[in-house]
Amino acid sequence: MSFDRKDIGIKGLVLYTPNQYVEQAALEAHDGVSTGKYTIGLGLTKMAFVDDREDIYSFGLTALSQLIKRYQIDISKIGRLEVGTETIIDKSKSVKSVLMQLFGDNHNVEGIDCVNACYGGVNALFNTIDWIESSAWDGRDGIVVAGDIALYAKGNARPTGGAGCVALLVGPNAPIVFEPGLRGTYMQHAYDFYKPDLTSEYPYVDGHFSLECYVKALDGAYANYNVRDVAKNGKSQGLGLDRFDYCIFHAPTCKQVQKAYARLLYTDSAAEPSNPELEGVRELLSTLDAKKSLTDKALEKGLMAITKERFNKRVSPSVYAPTNCGNMYTASIFSCLTALLSRVPADELKGKRVGAYSYGSGLAASFFSFVVKGDVSEIAKKTNLVNDLDNRHCLTPTQYEEAIELRHQAHLKKNFTPKGSIERLRSGTYYLTGIDDMFRRSYSVKP
């Protein structure tokens, strides 16, 4: 049977964010650090968080149910559901299997969970696109769910937490179309961030090394993308980053996104060594080897200065979500996409090309691209992002710590009833009601 495989991409999108946050400026004062350490140094304003009433299952159920409702999806016409997450509740049972309770009598649904730090969501998306392009496709659409709850022990990393979950409707004839064959990937073994202790929600993090890995993987993935882009489309004139009208990045912090966009120039400089825009960093580019360039602050500062105006126009709109929510791990890059759709008018986005970089520690990374071919005004409207973020509850740092303590008390427990209030949850949010003596979890929906 022949199916229409034209313009494969994103047809619908929902981003779920918790309905409470803590101000990063308040955390600075509470933690006794210098003013601006989190807000300026990391580029963060607010951090979303949850207590023991929400987990990755409830996140997925909430995001998926909202996608189905807002887009009036006939679930019998969904042939794949794939999940990306690193928030693990069970070492055997997948998050995808929990979400199947929303599919009624439709049991013929391919896909499973993808796990590798923050990269799993993009890998789930790639798998879904590849499924539609393959002989296994049966003509139905796919759904990708990506979400996490990012928590850190007390210390420098704690303000880089966050939480959120995205659900994407993927299929042909989409307004957001992925460019076929244009992906560059970089993978390597590294202990930069990992979670070997299953008795804790907290990761082991080598912070400086992880940022170095992020940049090194960006260099590799972007260079590999360029090889395929040149083979398909020929060499572009000028700097390579100017091929993209906008860019989105995985956002561990918003300051890191600004540095990452500037770093694209480092790879571009190899193809355009005499470009006059590089004059201010030409000596550094010629004297630093690749490894030293990863951590050289003078080069980083110089590249950021060159790309500042480009960043403000092409990237800044997308960091609205992570600035106000924090790091959502697998959902992070998609929160940036949601923000881009919400903050830039649909008529300005139409016809524009977007570059995208996904990174997951350990490590796995890809650079890819898509084109906004159709009208995305309805998608932007249905995300309801700005309204959701503007109407959340602002809690104190002490209340934040109390919520984290509730999660600590709930971790790995059975015969457990959550203590957190459901009062602040939005209508339609799934929440945990209890865990029985066999660790089976039960949920309800906030009316």
UniProtKB/Swiss-Prot annotation:
Transmembrane segments: none annotated. This is Hydroxymethylglutaryl-CoA synthase. GO terms for molecular function: hydroxymethylglutaryl-CoA synthase activity. The modification Phosphothreonine is found at T398. Hydroxymethylglutaryl-CoA synthase; part of the first module of ergosterol biosynthesis pathway that includes the early steps of the pathway, conserved across all eukaryotes, and which results in the formation of mevalonate from acetyl-coenzyme A (acetyl-CoA). Hcs1 condenses acetyl-CoA with acetoacetyl-CoA to form hydroxymethylglutaryl-CoA (HMG-CoA). The first module starts with the action of the cytosolic acetyl-CoA acetyltransferase eg10 that catalyzes the formation of acetoacetyl-CoA. It catalyses: acetoacetyl-CoA + acetyl-CoA + H2O = (3S)-3-hydroxy-3-methylglutaryl-CoA + CoA + H(+). The gene is hcs1. Gene3D superfamilies: 3.40.47.10. Its EC number is 2.3.3.10. Belongs to the thiolase-like superfamily. HMG-CoA synthase family. Pathway: Metabolic intermediate biosynthesis; (R)-mevalonate biosynthesis; (R)-mevalonate from acetyl-CoA: step 2/3. (3S)-3-hydroxy-3-methylglutaryl-CoA binds at C118, N156, T160, S210, H250, K259, N327, S361. It comes from the Eukaryota. The active site is at E86 (proton donor/acceptor), C118 (acyl-thioester intermediate), H250 (proton donor/acceptor). One of its GO terms (cellular component) is endoplasmic reticulum. One of its GO terms (biological process) is acetyl-CoA metabolic process. Disruption phenotype: Impairs growth in absence of mevalonate. Keywords: Lipid biosynthesis, Lipid metabolism, Phosphoprotein, Steroid biosynthesis, Steroid metabolism, Sterol biosynthesis, Sterol metabolism, Transferase. The keyword Nucleotide-binding does not apply. It is an enzyme of class 2 (transferase). It holds the Pfam family HMG_CoA_synt_N.
